[in-house]
Amino acid sequence: MWDAWDLDPFYRNSLRVVSDRSVSNVVVEHDRIEIHTHARVDSSTMELVWIFRSGAVGVDVHVEADWHEHEKLLKLAIPVEIHTDHAQYETQMGYITRATHENTSWDAYRFEVSAHRWVRLENASRSWAIANDSTYGWDVTRHQSDRRGTWSQVRATLVKSARFPDPQQDQGHHEWNFRIVPDASVLDAVAAGQQLNLREREVSGLPFEAPFTISGAVVESVAMAPDRSGDLVLRVYEAQGGPSQVTLTAPEATSVTACDLRYRPSEDEPHLRGGDGQWSFDLSAFQITTLRLSFTK
């Protein structure tokens, strides 16, 4: 009855690695290299493109699939050389941590985890982040190395192709984009996720300086106040999971007010210190706040 929603752990008993694959093309340009590979699974075909850009901090992966299977789960596996017992998965304005081992029954049944824009693995000396633009199911498992220690495998769930309630679920053409970033902090992972999901838009007009800069927090959204006052509304949050001192610089702003989610001034929001174009305030772990910036009319 819950075919499209449920994922049972025994799906791993019939796991099949796609072996019918080959490099089909290599494109070399002045600022990038693309390696195109093609693969086939029964009646379906896939293309995976590795994109290496000059000066980029990470590697991009573009996946396309012409999918015509039923009741088959398709995953993209990305092995990473890191010994760790946990992984971080982004939620809205924060992240959760889940074990990568199955030492307890609780851990074993967390075999699939939902994440928004990125997954991150870390230990004392290195870290990896994998950002995506359109898939939300992940599993990370720990494996014994042939040499010593362990390595981790990150797998993104691409399609499930259930038969109920839609017998044609996931049939047809699909595209996904990923970015693999080495030595990535939480803020690096957030940035990679934003870059994949919020593409740059070029607009015409005169150049201008940004009306504000902020450090110590992540800006999630910027909007004009709904009352048409000309005020600017920022929603910011602490992303790393610890207390942070935030500095907001807005040289043209006459005042900054901490508001609730409905843009109303609230004493429950962080206390703002400073003025004359620069304000500071404190945020606790994963705290969200809304700031209203007023400018001279």
Feature names for model-found ranges:
Residues M1-K297:
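C-terminal (or distal) subdomains of carbohydrate-active enzymes
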